[in-house]
Structures are given as structure tokens and as C-alpha cells.
């Protein structure tokens, strides 16, 4: 299946402006979360195109995926930035970010923000039904969420976190494909996983060119999501 190239619009819609503003708010509070969100948005667009979705839908998914962690605005920073593994109670608090994100983004009537609300709510659902918050399984999970889920996990594995160093591309792909104590092979849609493996080299190159250090201050100084997308592939 041939990937479709994104053609960013020059006119920012209200929902696009909202996505950028919310992303900047999140960056101001937690730079780690922001760099992660920006990369997930771009990777989701690329993967959606590879799966045959039209360019307009790829852009919509990208903008929505950019806000997938917006619910972390409600989570105490001392938990998000804790320099050691979380307790079971703290992990339970982290998991509430999906419902908080849905609450923040839903009810506007704007199709883009409603998609963002859906992704915020269900990007941690798993194909095998072991995810949260609703334990959805298989195609009960929307395709935008199945796409965002694998991009989210890949980027989280690569990224340095307060309590651990990021993985190499090779190790991150090994975990995604084979599983470990955090993941299982059955948690991803097989078709989405296959497509992601097909662009493994591109994904590695994109991440290497857009680490947290290289993205620092980039979006908040006037660079729009359109320009990030245009420069991605």
C-alpha cells in the first residue's frame, strides 16, 4: 500500500489553533510530555498514510494525537517527574489522565476536538483487551487509537524519563514486537504493527532528528504543526 504525502493547509482552523495552544500549555508545565506529544502526532500521520487513509484524515489524526496526553495537566508534577518507578497507587493516578483528557476535550461539537477527545480517552487500550480505561478489544478500538497507541509506546520507550534512560531504536522495536514486562506482542493491531515495522528505518531517523533537546522551544517560538509535518518526511 502506497503512503500518501501530507499537504499542510496554510489556513489554521480553530481546532488546529486549539491543538497548538493546548500543546504549548502542556510544554510549559512539562517539557518531556510535550516533545513526546509532538513526535507522536507526526508519527501517527505517517502511519495513517501508510495504512491508506486520505491526507486530510492523516492531518486530523495528527492534530488529535498531538493532544493524547493533555489529561496529564491534571496529574501532580511530583508524580509525572518522579525520578524512580511509580508505586501501584501512583500508577493508578497516572492512568486517570485518559479520562481527564476526554473531559478537557469533549463536548465542543468540533469534529477535530471530538477525535482528540476519543484518542485522549482510548490511546492506552490494547488489541488483546488488557488496556485501560475501558478494556476495549480488537476493532472495538478505533483505528486512530490503534495507530496512536503504537506511536505512543515507541516514543515513550525511546525517550529519557526521570527514572530511566531511553532505549535504542533496535531495543524499542524488539520490545514492541516481542514484548517484555511492560508490553505484550498481542497489545497492538497486527496490521498496524506490520505497517510500523515497514517504516522502522524512517521512524528511527525521524526520532533521531527530533529528540527532546532538538525540539526544545521549537513549537513555542512560532513553528506551527503544519511546518513540523512538512519537514518530517
Can you say where each PLM-predicted feature lies in the sequence?
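Histidine- and acidic-residue-rich, metal-dependent catalytic cores
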Residues: 5-233
